[in-house]
Swiss-Prot record:
Belongs to the alpha/beta interferon family. IFN-alphaII subfamily. GO terms for cellular component: extracellular space. SMART domains: IFabd. The keyword Signal applies. PROSITE patterns: INTERFERON_A_B_D. SUPFAM superfamilies: 4-helical cytokines (SSF47266). It comes from Cervus elaphus. It is found in: Secreted. This is Interferon tau.
Length: 195
């Protein structure tokens, strides 16, 4: 599961960074894969949102942190990786298999896995030994807590259809934030603090 999220993260990062700026070679295919994953997730809707209004919840997506330019390059890469990994983990459970169309779900899992694989190469080149420290603190820990809240919500709602629909909408927000962070990395040549 972690491998797939790593792949998704790699694809996203590749699509939003100029060649060589992050010390890795991610193709334009990575960007397209990120868009395809977002589209697949949108197609997974099974219930009208109006039927699930009572189940809505603010999960506290760390959107400002992800999109607001607060992250250094190595932190941004670690956050991208963690978000993709957690998305992959969420959709790679037995309970998610029962909730979604299996064909769409498998395509999403495959796309996330590919992005994580691509990002793993970049993560290793850019962060090296620092990665384990970055994953245990700061922004990456914030991402882990965000996804832990989603898992707790699903458990509390007993993995109901509406709970999964609410989570699906939230994951669309998360993947959109990932895309914006990738674009920012690409525009800034990997330097998130550039004007």
């Amino acid at each position: 599961m972690a491998f797939v999220l790593s792949l998704l993260m790699a694809l996203v990062l590749a699509s939003y960074s100029p060649g060589g700026s992050l010390g890795c070679d991610l193709s334009q295919n990575h960007v397209l894969l990120g868009r395809q994953n977002l589209k697949l997730l949108g197609q997974m809707t099974r219930l009208s949102p109006r039927f699930c209004l009572q189940d809505r919840k603010d999960f506290g997506l760390p959107q400002e942190m992800v999109e607001g330019g607060q992250l250094q390059k190595d932190q941004a890469i670690s956050v991208l990786h963690e978000m993709l990994q957690q998305c992959f983990n969420l959709f790679h459970t037995e309970r998610s298999s029962a909730a979604w169309d299996t064909t769409l779900l498998e395509q999403l899992r495959t796309g996330l896995h590919q992005q994580l694989d691509d990002l793993d190469a970049c993560l290793g080149q850019v962060m090296g030994k620092e990665d384990s420290d970055l994953r245990r603190m700061g922004p990456t820990l914030t991402v882990k807590k965000y996804f832990q809240g989603i898992h707790v919500y699903l458990q509390e709602k007993e993995y109901s259809d509406c709970a999964w629909e609410i989570v699906q909408v939230e994951m669309m927000r998360a993947l959109s934030s990932i895309s914006r962070l990738q674009k920012r990395l690409r525009k800034m040549g990997g330097d998130l603090n550039s004007p």
